[in-house]
C-alpha cells in the first residue's frame, strides 16, 4: 500500500471575479521512505496542493477528488479527526521561519503544546522530549535556549526549531514548503543535510516544494514538475536531470547555472509569464511560451503518459500528435 495516494484532485477558489483553478485533476502516489520533490514557478499550484492535503485551504477554497493516507480517506474527514492527523501523522514546515513561530510564546511553550495535544504528555515529559528533538536538529545549548523567544534565534536556528517541532510526533509524512527560501545560501545546505539525516533516522517520507533545482537534486528520489495546476512531468531525480522530456522542464533546467560544464554557457530564460489561472487557455497551458508548439497544442490538453518506465510526460510532441 502506498503511503499517500492523491487521485483526481481539484482545488478551486471563489473570488469576486470568478473561480480560480489552482490544482487541476492531479494524481500521484508516494511510497514510505520516499522523498518527492515538487518544482515549478510561482503560481503553479505547488503550495495549494499540499495545503489541500493538509486541509488548510483559505475559507474561499474547496477541494474535490481523493487523498488517502495509508488507505484512510482525508477528503471529507471531520475537522476534529483531521486535527488529530495534522502535526501528528502529517507535519508541515512552512516557508518563512521568521513569521511562523508565535513571537509571544517561548520555544518551550510552542513545542510542548504539540506533545501535550497529540501524545497526552504532561508538561515535564513534553519539555524533556522537546529538548531531545532540539538536540537532534543541532541547536547549540538546547537546554539554555528552549525558554527563549523566537526573536532571540537567527533565521537558520528558527528553521531548525520549525523542523524540530514538525518532527516531535515522528510523522509518517513531512511536507516542507520552500524551507530554505528565506535563508542565506550558506545556511541552506546544512538544513538540507539535516533533513536527509533525520529522514534516514525516522524512516519517514518527505514532500519537498521549492523553486531551487539544486535543492531538488540534493534531497529528492522522484520529481514532479507542475505548471498551471497540472503535472507536466514526473520522473526519478537522476532521470529528470539527464533526460528532461517536457519543454517546460528543459526550460527550467537551462535557466540554472551549471558548474559541471567547462567554458562559458549562456543562460536562457522561458519567455512570457505563467497563465492566469482564472482564464486558462484551451489546450496546453504552456503553449504560448513554448517554441516547439504544434497546432494541436491550442486545441487539446495533453495527457500525462509514459515517456519511459517510471518517467511520465504530458506533451503532444512526445506522443506524436
Where are these regions (language model features)?
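Conserved ABC ATPase "signature" region
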Residues: 73, 125-144, 254
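P-loop NTP-binding/switch modules centered on Walker-like glycine-rich loops
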Residues: 175-179, 183-265
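ABC ATPase NBD coupling module
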Residues: 74-91, 109, 117, 239-244, ...
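A short, proline-enriched helix->beta-strand linker immediately N-terminal to the Walker B motif
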Residues: 168-172
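A short, flexible loop at the N-terminus of ABC-type nucleotide-binding domains that lies
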Residues: 3, 12-25, 56-62, 78-81, ...
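Conserved ABC transporter NBD signature motif
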Residues: 62-73
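Charged, flexible cofactor/metal-binding loops and thiol motifs
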Residues: 236-321
Amino acid at each position: 500500500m502506498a503511503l499517500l495516494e492523491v487521485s483526481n484532485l481539484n482545488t478551486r477558489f471563489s473570488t469576486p471575479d470568478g473561480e480560480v483553478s489552482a490544482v487541476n485533476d492531479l494524481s500521484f502516489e508516494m511510497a514510505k521512505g520516499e522523498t518527492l520533490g515538487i518544482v515549478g514557478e510561482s503560481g503553479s499550484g505547488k503550495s495549494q496542493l499540499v495545503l489541500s492535503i493538509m486541509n488548510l485551504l483559505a475559507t474561499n477554497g474547496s477541494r474535490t477528488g481523493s487523498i488517502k493516507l495509508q488507505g484512510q480517506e482525508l477528503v471529507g474527514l471531520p475537522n476534529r479527526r483531521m486535527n488529530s492527523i495534522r502535526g501528528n501523522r502529517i507535519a508541515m514546515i512552512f516557508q518563512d521561519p521568521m513569521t511562523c513561530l508565535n513571537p509571544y510564546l517561548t520555544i518551550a511553550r510552542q513545542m510542548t503544546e504539540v506533545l501535550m495535544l497529540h501524545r497526552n504528555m504532561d508538561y515535564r515529559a513534553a519539555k524533556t522530549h522537546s529538548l531531545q528533538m532540539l538536540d537532534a536538529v543541532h541547536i547549540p545549548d538546547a537546554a539554555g535556549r528552549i525558554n527563549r523567544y523566537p526573536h532571540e534565534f537567527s533565521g537558520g536556528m528558527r528553521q531548525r526549531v520549525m523542523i524540530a517541532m514538525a518532527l516531535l510526533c515522528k510523522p509518517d509524512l513531512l511536507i516542507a514548503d520552500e524551507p530554505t527560501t528565506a535563508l542565506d545560501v550558506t545556511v541552506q545546505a546544512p538544513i538540507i543535510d539535516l533533513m536527509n539525516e533525520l529522514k534516514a533516522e525516522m524512516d519517514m517520507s518527505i514532500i519537498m516544494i521549492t523553486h531551487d533545482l539544486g535543492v531538488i537534486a540534493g534531497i529528492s528520489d522522484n520529481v514532479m514538475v507542475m505548471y498551471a495546476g497540472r503535472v507536466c512531468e514526473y520522473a526519478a531525480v537522476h532521470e529528470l536531470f539527464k533526460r528532461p522530456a517536457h519543454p517546460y522542464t528543459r526550460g527550467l533546467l537551462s535557466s540554472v547555472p551549471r558548474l559541471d560544464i567547462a567554458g562559458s554557457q549562456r543562460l536562457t530564460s522561458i519567455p512570457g509569464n505563467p497563465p492566469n489561472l482564472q482564464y486558462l487557455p484551451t489546450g496546453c497551458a504552456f503553449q504560448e511560451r513554448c517554441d516547439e508548439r504544434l497546432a494541436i497544442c491550442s486545441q487539446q490538453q495533453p495527457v500525462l503518459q509514459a515517456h519511459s518506465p517510471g518517467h511520465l510526460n504530458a506533451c503532444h510532441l512526445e506522443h506524436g500528435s
